[in-house]
């Protein structure tokens, strides 16, 4: 052990050991930004009695150290010269910026003023130390690297037994390297404890708060000293910009606190069980407990429960403040008495202050955190606990609108969703497709955009929610809203602008609805009864297709999305029936309620359409030119004809003619010709201009299939041949005037034809105006035209129309027939009911009668060789755009086989069918 000690002879001839300079353990750099004074400086300046072994430093130089063998290992220091004042417990630490709950506020003076105060602190300490016992020693080591003098008597060097003493010089302590001392591990220990009691005490507190040397707990202790015991709460020299009155106030405030509230806890090992005042749990005997002299003698805490009642942090070095039977750290105890400035972290001693956001500021300190502009009486915005003026806030934190890319100011409304921001205006916060405002409405965010509906998110036009809203169609399709028409005014003209579509429609009601028949001899009351047939229930199940510019959009006529359902066949009121019984026609009945009886010829045509047999368009013997002329003619009022708009006439205006035929029969009773005595060509010639109206209206329907005036309820029963009325067609034809179907006589009805012949019908031309390919196919129809003229002459009938218009009608019919060959609709085969209908006519004794003269084979071709051309292959059922009800393969194949089986008995007759 002597090898570690050197001896020297001083000027008095006395040999004394040479004490080497103190060796210190290396300390890791501290993360705390402020320089902390060493524990040595705390003890030398403030005389904090950290332990019973603490040595008071005398103001005079000590005599030379004695030999280690002559000096005791533990030297007991004399008692303190004076009783420790409250100020002795408050080390003059440097100020720490106030850290609020957000952790972001800072002192506006910490950058310059506090650093200047720190530089003024250490020269004073060094000057004081020059007269101390270690005047010949080097200056104190860097802060944070020196252990506490309370532990100086027991801290050993790494390799020997020489230590430095806290008060009486160094002590040579023979310590085995493996044994270790309990107190050498800590930078601070509670006073008055044995080593085993120190270990027991620190085992009761969290590990990260135990002040081991060079540990996280040591750095935590230093931070808590600055946080819990702010120096500017006690010393005037650490404050800034105080007036003389405020300086006096601070001294009085600090002295009062120390006198009335300051104390230090005492750690003892309990002899009996105690109840912790903090948690209420029992402290067992033998455990360590903390007592406070300013509380009742029996009050005790667990070491981990001796915390501040506000911040819940362990009271650093057991220094506490008492108020109303509660424990406080120095910071929060001062705040219970006076407010603290959120900017400079100092106690506000002035009479006035600014309070905002639940905190207080000096009046001059409540300023913008960025530009230091005072905000007293001004608008400001708090962000992260810091006030900003509006200009600085916009420059630093303003969001940008996703629509216009302009910044959203603090004075402007803002809409935010999922990290996106918009101006709260109708132009910015709007649907990305239709640009309708979404303010105050639910919206659909998708792919970074916002939409008002699912349709808009898919790029489609919005769908109306009910039938009263006009349907939004493509730009070239212009329709008038259904609500714009006055149904109660029969003279009101309503001309919808129906755009063209290349697909004609066939009404599904012709296949689905229950037919109603009424003979021609029935009265008008019976006809009105048939008007209110329950067709709307079936009509609501249909589907309407909107087609414009090859874009097909389908609406279901259920009353929710289709505008057509808003005027679908309301039932006829009884007043309408009784008011019009005395009239020959019911013209004053509103157009949407008027459903006349059908003629037998129309019954047969519609029956063939329902039975999926090709419709005989060749028998429609009128020209479109005549219909167009009548369509544009002036209104000629008649005694029993209502003034209606021809635009309200549907695709089958011959329905209105059949009413007039029946009324002519009732008003002019003459000798009737038998129905079977009239050839089908006579019947076809008896159907005048409305036949061409069928062609033109079907062409119009092929171009506009959205909104037609009325739905097509079918009230005829063509499946009961016994109820077929006997009509004086020949006399009625001769008695009809040329201008019969003028503007005031056409009754609003419609029949829709279904078929897909986009490739054969032009988009903007009617049949009668086509040229080129259509005329090249007219030779066969012209030859048939001559046969029809001969048949008319042999039957003794005279046609009311010139041969030119007659040929032109067949020219258009030929074009229709040729186009119908390519239509998938022509794959539909006749059903059983239509075959039974033909068998019934044959059973009457007229095998070569009119019922087979208008068969599907003769209507389109004169030989059975064209049947294969007429019936397309089965697999092409799915070609093109399908509208309404298309048969699937199984139904189509079944009907195909049934047609082939039923067509053999008539194949020979069909081949030998000659028109003369």
Swiss-Prot record:
- This chain's protein is named Protein prickle
Q: Which residues form the PET domain?
A: 167-275
Q: Which family does it belong to?
A: Belongs to the prickle / espinas / testin family.
Membrane-protein topology: Peripheral membrane protein
* Residue stretches making up the LIM zinc-binding domain: 274-338, 339-399, 400-462
Protein's GO biological process: anterior/posterior axis specification; establishment of planar polarity; establishment of tissue polarity
* Polar residues: compositionally biased ranges: 507-517, 526-569, 642-654
Give residue spans, biased composition: Basic residues. Answer: 777-793
Annotated SMART domains: LIM
Key words of the record:
Cell membrane, Developmental protein, LIM domain, Membrane, Metal-binding, Repeat, Zinc
Q: How does it assemble?
A: Interacts with dsh; PET and LIM domains interact with dsh DEP domain, in wing cells. Interacts with Vang in photoreceptor cells.
The principal localisation class reads: membrane
Question: Which locations, inside or outside the cell, does it occupy?
Answer: Cell membrane
Query: Which gene codes for it?
Result: pk
Describe the function of this protein.
Answer: Acts in a planar cell polarity (PCP) complex; polarization along the apical/basal axis of epithelial cells. PCP signaling in the wing disk requires the receptor fz and the cytoplasmic proteins dsh and pk. These act in a feedback loop leading to activation of the jnk cascade and subsequent polarized arrangement of hairs and bristles. Dgo and pk compete with one another for dsh binding, thereby modulating fz dsh activity and ensuring tight control over fz PCP signaling. Vang, stan and pk function together to regulate the establishment of tissue polarity in the adult eye.
Naming one, the record's GO cellular component terms include:
plasma membrane
Supply the source organism for this entry.
Aedes aegypti (Yellowfever mosquito)
For region Disordered, the annotated ranges are: 49-105, 127-176, 460-593, 635-671, 692-725, 763-870
| InterPro entries, alphabetized | LIM1_prickle, LIM2_prickle, LIM3_prickle, PET_domain, PET_prickle, Pk/Esn/Tes, Znf_LIM
Q: Bias category Basic and acidic residues: which stretches?
A: 829-844
An example Pfam family from this entry, by short name, is: LIM
MF terms (GO), sorted A to Z: zinc ion binding
**Sorted alphabetically, which Gene3D superfamilies does this protein's record hold?**
Cysteine Rich Protein (2.10.110.10)
Compositional bias, Low complexity, is annotated for: 145-156, 655-671, 796-805, 852-867
Q: Which residue stretches does the UniProt record annotate as biased composition, category Gly residues?
A: 157-171
């Amino acid at each position: 052990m002597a090898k570690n000690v050197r001896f020297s002879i001083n000027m008095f001839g006395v040999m004394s050991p040479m004490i080497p300079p103190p060796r210190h353990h290396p300390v890791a750099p501290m993360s705390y930004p402020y320089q902390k004074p060493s524990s040595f400086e705390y003890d030398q300046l403030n005389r904090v009695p950290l332990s019973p072994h603490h040595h008071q430093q005398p103001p005079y130089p000590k005599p030379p150290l004695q030999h280690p063998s002559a000096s005791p290992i533990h030297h007991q220091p004399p008692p303190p010269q004076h009783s420790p004042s409250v100020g002795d417990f408050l080390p003059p630490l440097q100020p720490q910026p106030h850290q609020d709950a957000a952790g972001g506020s800072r002192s506006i003076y910490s950058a310059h003023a506090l650093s200047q105060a720190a530089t003024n602190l250490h020269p004073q300490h060094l000057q004081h130390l020059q007269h101390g016992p270690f005047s010949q020693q080097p200056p104190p080591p860097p802060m944070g690297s020196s252990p506490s003098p309370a532990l100086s008597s027991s801290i050993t060097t790494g390799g020997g037994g020489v230590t430095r003493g806290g008060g009486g010089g160094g002590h040579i302590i023979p310590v085995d390297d493996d044994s270790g001392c309990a107190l050498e591990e800590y930078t601070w220990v509670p006073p008055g404890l044995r080593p085993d009691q120190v270990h027991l005490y620190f085992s009761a507190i969290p590990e990260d708060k135990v002040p081991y040397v060079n540990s996280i707990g040591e750095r935590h202790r230093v931070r808590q000293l600055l946080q819990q015991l702010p120096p500017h709460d006690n010393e005037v020299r650490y404050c800034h910009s105080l007036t003389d009155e405020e300086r006096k106030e601070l001294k009085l405030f600090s002295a009062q606190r120390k006198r009335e509230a300051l104390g230090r806890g005492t750690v003892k090992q309990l002899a009996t069980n105690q109840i912790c005042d903090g948690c209420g749990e029992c402290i067992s005997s033998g455990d360590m407990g903390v007592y406070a002299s300013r509380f009742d003698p029996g009050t005790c805490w667990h070491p981990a429960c001796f915390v501040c009642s506000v911040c819940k942090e362990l009271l650093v070095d057991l220094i506490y403040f008492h108020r109303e039977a509660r424990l406080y750290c120095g910071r929060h105890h001062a705040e219970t008495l006076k407010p603290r400035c959120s900017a400079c972290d100092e106690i506000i001693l002035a009479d006035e202050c600014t309070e905002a956001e639940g905190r207080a500021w000096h009046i001059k300190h409540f300023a913008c955190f960025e530009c230091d502009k005072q905000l007293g009486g001004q608008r400001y915005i708090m962000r992260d606990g810091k006030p900003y003026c509006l200009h600085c806030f916009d420059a630093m934190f303003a969001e940008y609108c996703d629509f216009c890319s302009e910044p959203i100011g603090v004075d402007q409304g803002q809409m935010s969703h999922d990290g996106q921001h918009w101006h709260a205006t109708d132009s910015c916060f709007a649907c990305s497709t239709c640009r309708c405002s979404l303010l105050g409405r639910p919206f659909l965010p998708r792919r970074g955009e916002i939409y008002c509906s699912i349709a808009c998110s898919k790029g489609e036009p919005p769908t109306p929610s009910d039938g009263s809203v006009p349907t939004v169609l493509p730009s070239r399709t212009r329709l008038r809203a259904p609500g714009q028409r006055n149904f109660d005014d029969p003279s009101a003209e309503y001309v919808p602008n129906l755009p063209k579509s290349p697909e004609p429609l066939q009404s599904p009601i012709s296949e689905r609805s229950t037919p109603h028949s009424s003979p021609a001899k029935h009265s008008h009351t019976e006809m009105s009864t048939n008007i209110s047939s329950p067709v709307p229930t079936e009509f609501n199940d249909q589907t309407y297709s909107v087609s414009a510019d090859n874009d097909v959009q389908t609406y279901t006529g259920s009353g929710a999305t289709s505008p057509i359902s808003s005027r679908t066949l309301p039932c006829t009121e009884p007043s309408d029936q009784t008011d019009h019984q005395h009239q020959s026609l019911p013209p004053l009945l509103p157009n949407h309620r008027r459903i006349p009886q059908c003629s037998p010829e129309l019954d047969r045509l519609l029956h063939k359409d329902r039975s999926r047999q090709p419709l005989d368009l060749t028998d429609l013997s009128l020209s479109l030119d005549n219909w167009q002329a009548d369509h544009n003619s002036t209104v000629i009022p008649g005694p029993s004809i209502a003034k209606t708009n021809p635009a309200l006439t549907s695709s089958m205006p011959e329905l209105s003619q059949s009413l007039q035929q029946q009324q002519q029969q009732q008003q002019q009773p003459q000798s009737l010709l038998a129905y079977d005595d009239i050839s089908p060509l006579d019947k076809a010639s008896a159907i005048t201009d409305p036949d061409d109206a069928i062609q033109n209206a079907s062409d119009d329907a092929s171009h506009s299939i959205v909104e037609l005036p009325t739905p097509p309820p079918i009230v005829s029963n063509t499946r009961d041949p016994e109820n077929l009325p006997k009509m004086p067609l020949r006399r009625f034809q001769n008695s009809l005037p040329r201008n019969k179907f003028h503007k005031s006589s056409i009754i609003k009805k419609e029949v829709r034809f279904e078929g897909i012949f986009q490739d054969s019908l032009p988009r903007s031309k009617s049949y009668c105006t086509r040229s080129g390919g259509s005329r090249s196919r007219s030779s066969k129809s012209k030859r048939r035209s001559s046969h029809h003229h001969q048949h008319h002459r042999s039957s003794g009938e005279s046609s009311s129309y010139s041969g030119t218009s007659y040929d032109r009608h067949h020219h258009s019919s030929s074009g229709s027939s040729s186009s119908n060959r390519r239509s998938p609709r022509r794959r539909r085969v006749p059903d059983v009911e239509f075959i039974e209908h033909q068998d019934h006519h044959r059973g009457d004794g007229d095998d070569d009668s009119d019922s087979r003269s208008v068969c599907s084979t003769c209507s389109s071709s004169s030989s059975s060789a064209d049947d294969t051309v007429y019936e397309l292959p089965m697999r092409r059922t799915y070609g093109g755009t399908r509208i309404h009800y298309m048969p699937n393969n199984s139904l189509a194949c079944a009907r195909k086989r049934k047609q082939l089986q039923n067509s053999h008995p008539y194949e020979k007759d069909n081949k030998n069918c000659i028109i003369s």
